[in-house]
């Protein structure tokens, strides 16, 4: 075997590893995310395979065979726009952010090059050089998938049950039986792809999709035959080997059109049956993910298939068989049951679709949709701030929290939808927010050229190839899916998407532009190969560092949970040493140092975390606390407290700490303190400390009536708050106003709280509650307690006006509405009751009582 042949084999092994091992290998107790190993494998494997391809091309006397693609110019333009936008951010944004801009830009830029660009180019190059044959030993593929899948059934009983320390990675990874199954699988996959054609690798992807889908379906119905415990990180949604249901769903959206196209064009009955079974398995797993954006993407992909004249002709010629398959698929969807591993919310396929009706309601919110509205609005703000070049390539996650904070300060509607978004959940806004109109223009030009070429080539030989047609439709489906999803920004779904896009361009390109040999001097070709090899080497070493960093971080995380701070510190320091900087690992290390009272080290680690990603409010808050309480750097502390509150006004601690800091020097910071506290009591109306601090600030401004009202509210919420009582009593002496009425009943309010806390619902307690409610008619708490006690006694009619008054005075608490709804229900006022339970859920979506009562009301009688 020549060196050239050897490199061809290396390339094939690497591509097999990416297609087969990449989607299927995962560890549940080794790294924070089970798909970390998948990321490392693909982000190293693809560049190495590209380098192996470059070696074979560099040694061809005829020159490099570079695919001539109609999308090359817009793709290069997009890369330039991405780089220019990042450079603009680095030079223009505050210097404080530069380390984080560098870190996030490098991380996302490397993904763009090593996964997206490299996969697309490698796939298109191989497809353009392919012989175009599509025959495969389908029986061999079927036998391989079934036998290899069955081998995993024995893992639960045959696996080694050794346990190791959190940092004993070999023990956590190694299992003799598992290794045996993987070796069998890898050699089987390599054997079946020995011809190295596009069709072989696509069938390998279909095989991996079938295995992952079958496992996901078993998970959904609580039949995990691999692990001895239930994997349920997403509330009953199937994750399979992907670690996230949205990744599996997009993977299947890419593959299902290929399976359907092969089914339609296959003549042999047994082979058609095989593709039909594959299609239905992929569909079942797609349903089990409960990912509606992917369901929509799949429908759009099937519509794209219908644009093929050949497939339409085949459908007309054998409409009965196609009807049976589509009928089976539709019936499965309509009858799809709830997951058996979900412990609470467990919708069916129909249930997930009917939830969309909540969007049309004038009142209330539907979090899955309105959270996206929040993200989209924030993405728009980011892009519109710098319309030409956007906020910076790869910097969405870094800057998103700051723009989201602006929205949260302004609109209480979005408060329970706050998130730390990695991406925008819409590819158009994703590109615009980061690279502006220039980048978006290049992005749209790329896909316009892509699909215009598909339309043109479909009239020729490519339009007769079911693999090519299916791959093109799969690209349509995944793009549609990612108008509401983020999956193509993660390694495995991104890899299959860009691989299929490359297949479409390279295989279709044989209809038009032929590969043009690059006959540069040998020295220049050697230099080009050296550049690709250097890129691949850096990618591989970078992924070794990435994997080690993640493994050591998770070991440290587990040691923290074991209360072994010394071991946690050592593990997290190892994580930092491997690098590159990672915000969560460095933040955890800072917390360990702080708990060990090594405050200088804690502050340094928190600063390093901000240098990795400066978008986390908790890091600013912890750093400010260390500066303020332990290092005596109060001026620095103030700046970081202010940023923490700007990013996240929904933190209970941030406004409390910031306002307390301001009120140390009211002559200097009184107005900022009032701004913070007025917003704090709006956002946390039941927090007595915020009301007490607001009262103090208002008293400093001599706004006596408002100060009295704030102190009174604090005592109404927490009668035991002695500081508020003393402040309110002192207010009367300072202002010359009469004593606040609540001071006369505060003792009785404390006694009532104590009685209710002790579950003393006696006549004496009821009488005390009635007395307090009469004396403080504007106290929502007093009216609520009295009404609730009346309700518990069966005096429903008497309870209603008390609870109505409580709800009128306190509009932000769910408890009053739940009890009022229960009272209405007892009186037969079903529609009024349903309205109150629905209102309670708008205020507190997780309120179990309201959920159960509303469900009972809507159940058929």
Predicted regions and their residues:
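Alpha-helical transmembrane segments of multi-pass inner-membrane proteins
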Residues: 2-28, 43-55, 76-87, 108-236, ...
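Interfacial juxtamembrane loops and adjacent helix segments
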Residues: 93-99, 164-166, 219, 224-239, ...
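Hydrophobic alpha-helical transmembrane segments in integral membrane proteins
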Residues: 336-351, 524-563
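Helix-start (N-cap) detector for alpha-helical repeat units in TPR-like alpha-solenoids
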Residues: 548-552, 583-584, 617-618, 652-653, ...
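Residue-level recognition of tetratricopeptide repeat
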Residues: 557, 591, 625-626, 660, ...
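Structural signature of tandem alpha-helical TPR/SEL1-like repeats
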Residues: 563-570, 596-608, 629-643, 664-679, ...
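Structural marker of alpha-solenoid helical repeat scaffolds
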Residues: 578, 612, 647, 683-684, ...
